[in-house]
Amino acid sequence: MARARRRTRPTVLSDRQAGGGSLPAQTGAKRRTAVLRRLYPLLAFLGGFTWDALTIGQRVRVVDFWRLGAFLVGAALLALWLARREALDRAPPAPAATLRGRLASLAWQAPYLLLQFFFGGIFSALFILYFKSSGHLGTWLTASFLAALLVGNEFAGNRYGRRFTLTWTLFALNAILLCNFALPHALGSLQPLWFYASTVAGATLTHILRWLAPGRPGRIGPSWALAVVLMLAFRLDMIAPVPLVKRQLAAGQDFVQASGRYSLQVERAAWWQWWRDQAEIVHVPEGGRLYGLSAVFAPIGVTADLEHRWEVRDPDGWRLVYRRPFTTTGGRDRGFRGYSWVLNPPPGDWRFIVATQDGRTIDILRLQVVRGTPAANEVLVREID
């Protein structure tokens, strides 16, 4: 009689015996990896932003325009490459664990990453430049919009290659904002005409780029719509008067001009008003003068027609009390200085404004004038050299 064969049971190894670690440990590692992947764009953004803030510094240099122009050319070439790949209907490589498969996957993703890098580099630098040129709510909103795009770019990834309308629109925004800076700088003039011309030039450049792209993917209409929105924002004084950058703004008494230095007595801001250079309240004695000082940087070769405006709030709104026009010549690192004053200003709410003579606001200092003399321990001297 044949011996019955014994059925063997397969050996089942636990997760720890199989060398894979416990299931909770594997899950935790995957979660940490996922979190790091999500944080990587933010860390890259902070690193790039810090680098631009340090390298661009406190003034606009010609080398900055050349660098940003190179980024824009790189973005244009990558957009054409992605359009060609789209027209050839090439599929991404299949996932593989081998070195060759990983290199193929990296090569496929490289254009997306480089385009993201170029857009991020331009957005970061332009945000810093527009941030430095912003001086009131409207321009702060525009700078905040650029900041939102800067952060959003870090999470866009390969959407640029799959949604060409987005690619053309962001390219148009980069080209327009860069031309808004570069054209006035090259011509040495801040006439409003150059803003409109540079805006149309940036949109036209994008239109030509799409026309050259194989298959002409995506739509160009949103790029032109963006140009119209920017020109409307310019009319509403929501675009900072680039490339002008406000250095200092102060209002007070006992103005002294000596040995190439301007000094002014101002009142200290409260300890918790860390963002203010001086107190909002200004004490002015009967018959006294209230002085205003400004320092505005303009690049070498740029001439700007500026003005000081003193306005007081009436029951019907803000009323112009005094306006002093003057012309700046660019190139001074600490900014071109100007001063003005009002005699015996009545108590109430005041605004000291430095702006271009065509109406674009550079900065606003809000004040509350009261009669009297400030306490000695609340006074300090500010110098603008």
Feature names for model-found ranges:
Residues 1-155:
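Membrane-anchoring hydrophobic segments
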Residues 162-212:
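Membrane-embedded alpha-helical segments of integral membrane proteins
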Residues 231-305:
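Membrane-interface segments at or immediately adjacent to transmembrane helices
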Residues 290, 329-339:
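Aromatic sugar-binding surface patches on proteins
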Residues 320-331:
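Solvent-exposed serine/threonine-rich low-complexity stretches and specific carbohydrate-binding patches
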Residues 347-358:
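Short, aromatic- and glycine-rich surface loops/edge beta-strands on solvent-exposed regions
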